[in-house]
Amino acid sequence: MTEKQMFDFLVAGGLSEHGAAVLLGHFQAESGLNSRNLQNSFQKKLGHTDDSYTEAVDNGTYSNFDRDGAGYGLAQWTYWSRKANLRNFAEQAGKSIGDPEMQLSFALHELSGYKTVIQALKTATSIREASDIVLEQYEKPADQSEEVKVKRAGYGQEIYNRCTGRNEEEKELNTRS
């Protein structure tokens, strides 16, 4: 699934163009938009590549997906209950845990429980403002520094420009109003 297809899927799912770009910007930072991405620091520890891990979880030969602590997928889901929910969502859909469309659907489903975040993504007209909300209230990485905020908003802005064909410059990229 291309970046543009992901963008269009999220817009069709109810996000504004800015909101879709913001969410994909965060996924770019987390996984490089690779839905089969196993957290790099766990590949050696678990003895798996992105593909072998995905296949082992899908076929049931690896049963510790929920609790192994490894980030996985577009959002690098890590916490055990979120990974269990992702796995269950994939199973119910009859899809691989690494299926990008399933993961985007899961993200939209999961975001419905984050009222402030989903509202920001549906109504966003500013990349930076919505990006900070996603960072602080949904992704919640350990590093929420200004440098990280600017970088993630920058990814969102680049994706917005590529996917819409506009060359919008975010005036508030470096400072939050």
Language model features with spans:
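Non-catalytic cell-wall polysaccharide-engagement segments
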Residues: 83-177
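Peptidoglycan-targeting cell-wall enzymes and recognition modules
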Residues: 1-5, 31-122
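Solvent-exposed, non-transmembrane amphipathic alpha-helical segments
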Residues: 26, 43-47, 150, 154
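Residue-level detector of well-ordered alpha-helical segments, enriched
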Residues: 18-23, 73, 103, 130
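Short acidic/histidine-centered micro-motifs embedded in hydrophobic/aromatic stretches
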Residues: 25-29, 40, 133, 137
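Export/targeting segments at the very N-terminus of extracytoplasmic proteins
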Residues: 1-33
